[in-house]
Amino acid sequence: MGILVKGEITITKGFKTWKEMVYAQDGKLKEHGIKFIFAGTQKDDPSKLHTVMQFPNMEAIQAFRDDKELTEKRKEAGAVIESAVMTPISDEYFTNYPN
């Protein structure tokens, strides 16, 4: 099933710009095995982006963090990389309840 990671990062160019970057980097994200379960901004602060991402393993998380090309694309889209917090979720969880 992979590893779920809750993420939070500051974005400075709006959600639309960030989302367009994600779609443009589809091949790179697939290369790392990344799947977005959720991505959206905080209702009272649109500069705070929250995500839930699925990675195949811890090595993929590290590869994502170390990918200089992808990091540069994220910066260009307004992501403040140094503000990022990524929290791996334990194996005890459920999703899409009650579906």
Q: Where are the language model's segments positioned?
A:
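Short S/T/G/P-rich N-terminal loop/turn motif that feeds into the first structured element of a domain
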Residues: 1-71, 82-99
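Short arginine-rich
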Residues: 71-77
